[in-house]
Amino acid sequence: AACAARESNGIGSMRFKSAAHSRSSFARGVAGTRASRPSARYGTVAHAYADADGVGAAFEGDIGAERKHLILVDGLSFVFRAYYGWSARGDGLQNAAGEDTGVLYSYANTICSLLELRPTHLAVCFDAKGKTFRHEMFVEYKANRPPTPEPLLDVIPKVENLVRDMGVPLLRLSGVEADDIIGTMTRRAADDGFHVSIVSPDKDFYQLLSPRVRMLRPSKTNKGDPFEPFTVEDFRVMHDHAIEPKQFVDFLALVGDSSDNIPGVEGVGPKTALPLLERYGDIETILANAATVKGKRARESLLSEKGAASAVLSRRLVEIRQNLTVPSLNEPFLPLDDLRVKPPADRGLAAMRAFERYELANAAERWKRVVRL
């Protein structure tokens, strides 16, 4: 049976040359914790918990009066990103017990960076184990992906525990993907007057962009801000103002997506899809007028039963659901107020214990500044 989980306690780049160095660095870093004071660098953001209603300059000042900003994190994407940036290279962080800790270090910094934006609401969304409704529609969905490496399978539960220790709500629902949770919470929040930031590198979220919804994509450099905003206007420029974000579902349905094994329509690539959508608007209208499509190969493919069926199936696969419910309860997935940022129930000490276990001195120091221990 499908079930929802909301798990919470409230709410760089460095290397250690050896585990011994890591351990001694941590001991120095956490000494005198309560006496520490925020550095000048963090002086403007150290009150992220104490003043959780503030949103700072998260949207360049255009939501300051509304004071409602929800950040939703595509949880697994950052686990993979951190893993292939650290542990998979074989030269990442380890603690004295020999545990790889680079992913945990990276994830802790990501959470701290997001809290420093001073959102009013925050959650990390993960996929549940098992197949989803998309696999029921198309058994080959994501079948081209290699198996998840064993070390990565080992670190995912540790990341989830760290998120909980940092007091951030962790969301998952069996039978659907994290994308659908993000889509549902985004739609609900935007309808309720929030501004929403979706933290992910995944282009599938383009379809959710609106004046109230942007993406925060990982920065391509290690300098400056860790995230790069991607807005509706950025999307329009990327696609030569030919389509709007809501049409991106139809675009992917036409061209396919090899990363998720979405078939698309044979003979229709990006250079063909954009003019089609600019002229006809959506898949349904394109198929209804397939005989008038310019270009013999695309026209014949769209007129064929196989091509039309593939277009319809592909659209259903790439569309992010925005209306999830909990079937067993027959009610909306989760109240937005459950995602409100608030001081950790234990004043941040569970996270400090985790940092001590994994010997992440720098992460501990940053956490102290954010939570004001």
Where are these predicted regions, by residue range?
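N-terminal mitochondrial targeting presequences
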Residues: 30, 38-52
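Short acidic/polar active-site loop segments enriched in Thr and Asp
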Residues: 120, 271, 361
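Extended two-metal-dependent nuclease catalytic cores across DNA- and RNA-processing enzymes
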Residues: 93-94, 143-328
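Hydrophobic alpha-helical scaffolding
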Residues: 97-100, 149, 266, 276, ...
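Domain-level signal for Mg2+-assisted phosphodiester chemistry and nucleotide/NA-binding surfaces
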Residues: 49-169
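Low-complexity, acidic/Ser/Thr- and charged residue-rich accessory regions of DNA metabolism proteins
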Residues: 47-69, 316-373
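N-terminal chloroplast transit peptides
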Residues: 1-32
